Amino acid sequence: MIHQYFAACPKGLEGLLLQELQALGATDTRETIAGVYFNGDLNLAYRTCLWSRLANKILLPLANFEVNSQEDLYEGVRMLPWQDHLSPSGSLLVDFVGTNDAIRNTQFGALKVKDAIVDCLRDFSGVRPNIAKRDPDLLVNARLSKNKLVLSIDLSGESLHRRGYRLKQGSAPLKENLAAGILIRAGWPEVAAQGGALLDPMCGSGTFLVEAALMAADIAPGLGRASFGFERWLNHRNDLWLTLREEAHHRRKLGLAKVNLPEIRGYDADVRVVRAAEENIISAELDHWLRVSRKELAEFKKPTHRAMDYGLVLSNPPYGERLGEIESLKLLYAHLGERLRNEFPGWRAGVFTGNPELGKQMGLRADKKYKFFNGTIASELLMFSINTDVFVQSRVEQDGRFSKDEVERDAAEQKVKAAAKEEQAAALSNGAQMLVNRLQKNRKQLEKWARKNEVSCYRLYDADMPEYAAAIDLYLGQTPPNRAPQLYAHVQEYAAPKSVDEARAAQRFADIEAAVPYALDIPVSHISYKQRRRNKGSSQYEKLNERPTGDLFSVQEGQAKLHINLWQYLDTGLFLDHRPVRHMIANMARDKRFLNLFCYTATASVHAAMGGARYTVSVDMSNTYLNWARKNFALNGLSEARNRLEQADCLKWLENNDQQFDLILLDPPSFSNSKRMEDILDIQRDHVEMIHNAMRSLSEEGTLIFSNNLRNFKLDLEALGAYNIEDISARTIDEDFKRNPKIHQCWLIRH
């Protein structure tokens, strides 16, 4: 049965909590102050109690009514069937929040609610329940706002931020769910997915460290709690709960068994605080993976025991209110900025502070600021990309020479750059100059469309000039961990026909190589050049070169973040022409069972999962692409428990499948003779049988999306006459591919 629930959280976490609930499977989510309403079944409520890193409470509303008098409150509560929720011999506790003219004291309000419940149960059975101040059988939550009371069962019991691992704490500890929200805002899930490290130079009792490890190892935050509020509720389903706990224990085991768990380390100058952090880490059973040690901030630097090319430095420095404390903190912030600039180039850094103005002392320019509340203290998370173009003069530096030098250095660099640009222009051939003009014209036209539609990757040029037969795609990518976006270009030169001699073909390619960096004003290192040919067998999966993986980056497409590799394979990991299809899948996927056949890097599955799919299954024969898909899921914080990847011949898999799916994407290659396939795949010849098999796996009300890139493909409508078929090809061609409307064809097929 579907119910509406309310997840309470600290102010500032509402948007993140909404996304988390959607990822857990919640529907009809609605954000409000300090919480999110959502719909789901009891299994989802249990899952949320176990897996939410951000919520304080999960409440099941029973009733809401007007309260204009004490009698209204008593009668409104008493009329509910409390015998359905609590045994008359059980124990009860009421949590009452809010006042109005009739109920001026929360203790009095709690007493009236308690009296009404007790009287109801006594009238029903002749027995009255006990009142328990700790660990009751039923915790009732009553919230009065103006004259409206919302009465709920508190399924969580003790606040969910109490994970169970914190035995000791520092002088001003962060609540665990606030720490988790800060980590998410700081981009830790993405950094961890890339194998980046987390370092906290002022770790206190280790809350950031433990919460970061729970995320990286896929450990449910509620797994260490002693109890929840629903366990002695009369409607409790212990079978559901035990299944969820077993799943969580299994995921924890798998997560901690990973050989590539990120490095997580903390430091603090106070040895007593370090000991408290160590005890908490042991309590969380993470002492084999987390390390804390006593270290002054002045000693803070990148560890050398293993390679750490990138990562996240995250800290919550001390707060101060008195003048002397503020002045000391200015120096502390300045020193922290110096440590970051000197020791962690290329990293990301986050500083959570109740004194945001102090961030200006760090000599770094924050690229993002997020507002939070630490209890009642308005706070901010300041995020920094640690590279020279965000370095600014610290307010505590003694004079202005640094600023003057930097201005002079920048002017010199601009002068050199301008001279190099002039040299490039002089070296362009007439043909290359024509190509430059076309690229710049196309970019001007497409950039407006791309910005309006939040498109970060698009096709700039597709053999617009026949003598320069190439496709040029632009990618606005972020290298880990979330550095400032940079522009990259992917150039695919189509093989010249035999009628064009090799010398002329070579000259045209040289023109392209000269024109692209000049027209786009990007470094050559950001451009990948390839020649597109029809590949055979496994060659389509072979690496083209051994360029370091550090050059990989991610792009944002809708809600999804996707890994891109411009250099090592023929394709980049993302087929740009299918962008509208992926967006369509994201919009169609909520609560659907999604199957992705010939899934490639599973980008459509990521969109489906981010769109609220019940679960996804992605099938492909290439282990290379499935590993890539795993990275895409991890990049978006999506678990393989609900997003299964299967290495198989898709045709054989379909023949043997007995599962039903509500949404299927069938996007096969036009031709394949891979050694792993028993037969050669020819899409024109084989599509009817393939679609019939896919339709057997489609639920009665489901939708099959069938697409392919064979230019002269003809769908056999007569052989597929039993189905409802809609050609949506025109709707799946975006602005950047309108020059080539035959880039793919696409149909919706239903029973």
Curated annotation (Swiss-Prot):
Q: What class of enzyme is it?
A: transferase
Q: What is its EC number?
A: 2.1.1.173, 2.1.1.264
Any Pfam family matching the protein: RlmL_1st
> Which molecular function terms from Gene Ontology are attached?
23S rRNA (guanine(2445)-N(2))-methyltransferase activity; RNA binding; rRNA (guanine-N7-)-methyltransferase activity
Give me the reactions it catalyses.
Answer: guanosine(2445) in 23S rRNA + S-adenosyl-L-methionine = N(2)-methylguanosine(2445) in 23S rRNA + S-adenosyl-L-homocysteine + H(+); guanosine(2069) in 23S rRNA + S-adenosyl-L-methionine = N(2)-methylguanosine(2069) in 23S rRNA + S-adenosyl-L-homocysteine + H(+)
Keywords, sorted A to Z:
Cytoplasm, Methyltransferase, RNA-binding, rRNA processing, S-adenosyl-L-methionine, Transferase
Q: Which SMART domains match?
A: THUMP
Q: Which GO terms describe its cellular component?
A: cytoplasm
Please tell me whether the keyword Chaperone is annotated for this protein: no
Chief location category: cytoplasm
User: Which PROSITE patterns does UniProt cross-reference here?
Assistant: THUMP
Compartments annotated for it: namely: Cytoplasm
Show where the THUMP domain sits: 44-155
| Segments crossing the lipid bilayer | none
The similarity annotation says:
Belongs to the methyltransferase superfamily. RlmKL family.
Known role? Specifically methylates the guanine in position 2445 (m2G2445) and the guanine in position 2069 (m7G2069) of 23S rRNA.
The protein's name is: Ribosomal RNA large subunit methyltransferase K/L
What organism does this protein naturally occur in? Cellvibrio japonicus (strain Ueda107) (Pseudomonas fluorescens subsp. cellulosa)
